[in-house]
Amino acid sequence: MNYANFGLDFLNSVANAAVEGKKLDLASRGLQLRSRALDTERDFNYAKLAFERHKFDTNNDLRIYGDAMRIQALRAAGLRINPYSNGRQIYQDEADLANLHSYYSFYKTD
């Protein structure tokens, strides 16, 4: 048995083990970064879906209940055209004004 070769082989195996350990460490860090990037992308996509759902629900509510909601908001703000109104019914002129207001506030952008 050649002790010089044994020592060189031993040092070579230790160096190879250190190199392989470093490769594994770098690979695990790469996987961690990739996993973190995928988690971030997933969270972003979930947030985007939640925002799109909220926007759809809001637009759907405005499409269905929009005029009634706007009239309620105008009534709550104290808008009363008819001085004889008791506050429990909406007259046609109030509905017309509410629709005109909704047209200019929600559909006109300039």
Curated annotation (Swiss-Prot):
GO cellular component, one term: host cell cytoplasm
Keywords in alphabetical order: Capsid decoration protein, Capsid protein, Host cytoplasm, Virion
Stored InterPro entries: Vesivirus_VP2 (IPR007996)
Subcellular localization: Virion; Host cytoplasm
Pfam families noted in UniProt: Vesi_VP2
Organism superkingdom: Viruses
Function: Minor structural protein that forms a portal-like structure at a unique three-fold axis of symmetry, following binding to the host receptor. The channel formed by VP2 may allow the delivery of the viral genome through the host endosomal membrane.
Assigned protein family: Belongs to the vesivirus VP2 protein family.
Other facts: Translated by a ribosomal termination-reinitiation process from the bicistronic mRNA coding for VP1 and VP2.
Subunit structure: Homooligomer. The portal-like structure consists in 12 copies of VP2. Interacts with capsid protein VP1.
Domain notes: The N-terminus domain points away from the virion surface.
Name used for this protein in its record: Minor capsid protein VP2
Upper taxonomic lineage: Viruses, Riboviria, Orthornavirae, Pisuviricota, Pisoniviricetes
